[in-house]
Each structure stands twice: as C-alpha cells, then as structure tokens.
C-alpha cells in the first residue's frame, strides 16, 4: 500500500510539474563542489559529481581542453525542470560549476529561490546587489556556506534577449570571480 501511495505522489508531481524524485538542487551541486570545511583545498575532486542526482554526463570522465578539464551534463533540477551543469577544473580539483537554469530567474525573488534550493541551515549572504541601469538583465552575487563545507560564491544571472529568449545561469566558485562585474 505504501509503494502505491508513493507512486501516486510521484505521478501527481510529474503531472503538475512539482518536485522530481531523482532531481538535483543547487544545494546538491554546491555540496559536490565545496570541499569539507577541514579540507586543505577549496573544492572537491571530480568524483564528487559522479553521483549527482539524475545527472546524465557527456562521457564517463572529464575531457581535457587546453590547460583545463571540462565535464558537461544534463540534470533535472528539483521543482524547475531540465537544466545543464558545466564543470571546469584542473586534473584533480574543480574550479567552478555553472548551472544553466531552465526558467527565467526573477532577480527580485533570488533570495526565495536560493532558500528553496539549499538545505535548511545553509548560510546565504548577498555580497552584491543590483547593477546600475539594470532593466531587463542583471545579476546578483551571494556567498553560500553549507553546514560542514567551505563557502562558495554564487553569481546568479538573468539576461533577456531581444528575440524573446532569455538566459538564466548560476555560476559557483570558491572565490569571488573578478569577471563578475556589472
């Protein structure tokens, strides 16, 4: 009886576009990227992403391109839909993770979005707000610290397109990227 009830809940979730059982959250991506607090390095190695919920990686391992390694995959994002994750790093440790968000990000609602995507107890602190002359596009920078993990910086972006399309991304790095300007 319990399995029938669980199946009905999952089917209702699929039908109404709610939570997916095998979907990752931004918190899952951040936990895979950020090293444990006691670790001497800021980020984890590549294997931390091998078990990301629902991820379908392109290839079995990262591929070298120039002086960096790259690994891209499709991943269902809890409560949002199908997104993509792009990882960049050295041979052993990661430098960054970028999540291509499948929906438009409402910049005014970023705090609520992050709170819904990270586990309770995560410290989320806005370190840069709106840019001057921000109308259709913009970004925000947050510092996120999950319990027992090193901090990460999140660059939350929404870019409108003159053809009606838009791009929404969340970049994660262990240090604030100087390229994240207005």
Language model regions located:
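Broad, structure-driven detector of short, well-ordered beta-strand segments within folded domains
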Residues: 78-89, 150-160
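N-terminal secretory signal peptides
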Residues: 25-87
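Mature extracytoplasmic/lumenal regions of exported proteins
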Residues: 136-143, 148
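Long, charged/polar, surface-exposed segments that mediate recognition or autoinhibition
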Residues: 80-139
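Sec/Tat signal peptide C-region and signal peptidase I cleavage site
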Residues: 17-23
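Short, exposed beta-strand-loop hairpins at the edges of beta-sheets
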Residues: 156-171
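Short, low-complexity, Pro/Ser/Thr/Gly-rich segments in the mature regions of secreted, periplasmic
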Residues: 167-182
């Amino acid at each position: 009886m319990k399995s029938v009830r669980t199946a009905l809940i999952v089917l209702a979730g699929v039908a109404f576009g709610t939570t997916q059982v095998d979907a990752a959250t931004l918190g899952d991506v951040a936990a895979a990227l950020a090293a444990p607090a006691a670790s001497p390095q800021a980020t984890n190695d590549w294997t931390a992403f091998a078990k990301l919920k629902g991820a379908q990686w392109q290839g079995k391992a990262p591929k070298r391109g120039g002086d960096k390694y790259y690994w891209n995959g499709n991943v269902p994002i809890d409560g949002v839909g199908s997104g993509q994750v792009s990882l960049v790093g050295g041979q052993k440790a990661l430098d960054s993770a970028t999540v291509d968000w499948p929906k438009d990000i409402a910049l005014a609602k970023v705090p609520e979005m992050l709170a819904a995507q990270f586990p309770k107890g995560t410290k989320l602190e806005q370190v840069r707000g709106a840019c001057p002359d921000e109308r259709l596009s913009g970004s925000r920078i947050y510092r996120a610290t999950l319990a027992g993990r090193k901090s990460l910086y999140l660059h939350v972006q929404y870019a409108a397109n003159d053809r009606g399309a838009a791009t929404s991304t969340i970049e994660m790095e262990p240090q604030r990227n100087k390229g994240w300007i207005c």
